[in-house]
Structure formats: structure tokens, C-alpha cells
Curated annotation (Swiss-Prot):
GO terms for cellular component: cytoplasm; extracellular region; mitochondrion; peroxisome. It comes from Emericella nidulans (strain FGSC A4 / ATCC 38163 / CBS 112.46 / NRRL 194 / M139) (Aspergillus nidulans). Its EC number is 1.11.1.24. GO terms for biological process: cell redox homeostasis; cellular response to osmotic stress; cellular response to oxidative stress; hydrogen peroxide catabolic process. This is Putative peroxiredoxin prxA. CDD domains: PRX5_like. The lineage of its organism: Eukaryota, Fungi, Dikarya, Ascomycota, Pezizomycotina. The gene is prxA.
Length: 168
């Protein structure tokens, strides 16, 4: 498959790895237990922003991409978005720690792992090193309403919160 585009259905049986946020496991040094997150099922009746990036704790991802979504979360919620999720090839432990390092609580933004970039590879949006590329997908009740892949690893425009908000 060569990416997703507006009008496509979100693929069936998409499963990510995820550690849910809990108060007792809220410290960055605490460790939760990964679970399967059945995205296709969970998002079937919701409005969702899924944005992906090459890796947790990396320069563009940590300095600009994630912080912009955190900052603009109230605006995103006001537009009727039920779920905001960030995706990378890192394992669920790293993604959980990255969410905590960014001060995200109560699953305000889901920090999901795409093990071996399986989903990203399935849509043709993984790089030659096996990492998720930088992209954004907006879903509304299982239908893609916006999908964009950045042209380069350090490019941040089409998957930015600012651009995605314009497409809600």
C-alpha cells in the first residue's frame, strides 16, 4: 500500500502496543505493563488524530512535534477530537516514559508503539531503517479525512498540529 488518503477506510485489525497512564505509575521511573491497543476497534466510532514520528526523545520530535500537540490540545478537543495519539517504532516502555517526560497525564495523548513499524510499513510510511516516518492521519468514525506524509525526516509541516487543526 502506498499511504492512506482522504476517503479511505482505516485498515482493519490494527494493533499497537501501549502502557496506559495511571496515577500510581505516573513517575518516569515507574514501569507499567504493555497491553495490546486495538486501534481499529477503539477508533471505529471516534474522531482521532494519529501522528507518527521517527522516534521518541529525538530532536524535532521532542522539541517541536509533540510539544505543539500538547500545547494545542484544548483547541483540538474543542474541534470534537476524541483521541490524540502519537506513534513511533520505539517499544511501549520508551513511549510511556516519553509521555511522562512530557508531563502528559490521564491519557490526554496516547503514546503508542508501532512494534517493528508494522502498521507504518503496511501503509508504506516506514523508512529504510525500519522506523516510522513522520506523518499524520485524521479519522472520523473509521474513515480517513486527512493523511499526509512529510517529505523528509526532519521536515515538520503537514503533520504539525497547526496544519492538522486546519483539516478538522
Amino acid at each position: 500500500m502506498s499511504g492512506l488518503k482522504a476517503g479511505d477506510s482505516f485498515p482493519a485489525d490494527v494493533v499497537f502496543s501501549y502502557i496506559p497512564w495511571t496515577e500510581e505509575k505516573g513517575e518516569i521511573t515507574s514501569c507499567g505493563i504493555p497491553i495490546n491497543y486495538y486501534a481499529s476497534k477503539e477508533w471505529a466510532d471516534k474522531k482521532v488524530i494519529l501522528f507518527a514520528l521517527p522516534g521518541a526523545f529525538t530532536p524535532v520530535c521532542s522539541a517541536r512535534h509533540v510539544p505543539e500537540y500538547i500545547e494545542r490540545l484544548p483547541e483540538i478537543r474543542a474541534k470534537g477530537v476524541d483521541v490524540v495519539a502519537v506513534l513511533a517504532y520505539n517499544d511501549a516502555f520508551v513511549m510511556s516514559a516519553w509521555g511522562k517526560a512530557n508531563g502528559v497525564k490521564n491519557d490526554d495523548i496516547l503514546f503508542l508503539s508501532d512494534p517493528e513499524a508494522k502498521f507504518s510499513k503496511s501503509i508504506g510510511w516506514a523508512d529504510e531503517e525500519g522506523r516510522t516516518k513522520r506523518y499524520a492521519i485524521v479519522l472520523d468514525h473509521g474513515k480517513v479525512t486527512y493523511a499526509a506524509l512529510e517529505p523528509a525526516k526532519n521536515h515538520l509541516e503537514f503533520s504539525s498540529a497547526e496544519t492538522v487543526i486546519k483539516h478538522l
